[in-house]
Amino acid sequence: MSICKHGAPFVVQHENRYGSGASQSSLLSKSIHHISNSHEAINFISCYSANGSCFSNAQMLANASGSPVIGYYGKVNKLTASLANSGRIFRPQHKLAANICYVGNRLLSAP
């Protein structure tokens, strides 16, 4: 499954609203579960989705969805995302680590 969203470090656009990767990932996860209950990897085509490592938007989506997520460093589009080895895989974290990283993502997304 692929998801294409506008993104910036620690910020994602969803339904014409910008917010932290942490807050938007829970909304994205709910949308994903309406489509599929599969735990296949999610290809998160969003600029800067891998930036920030454990605080990244891709990690937030992995934690919210319970599925592995492929995120990208820097600017990305559908064409560059299809290149071999262009993304990084993020796996869901344990609850304590996920909560700490959630707070970190929210803090880093603040203006």
What are these regions (language model features)?
Residues A41-P111:
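Active-site-proximal C-terminal subdomain of hydrolase catalytic domains
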Residues M1-S53, C101-Y102, L107-A110:
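Catalytic-core segments of thiol-dependent peptidases
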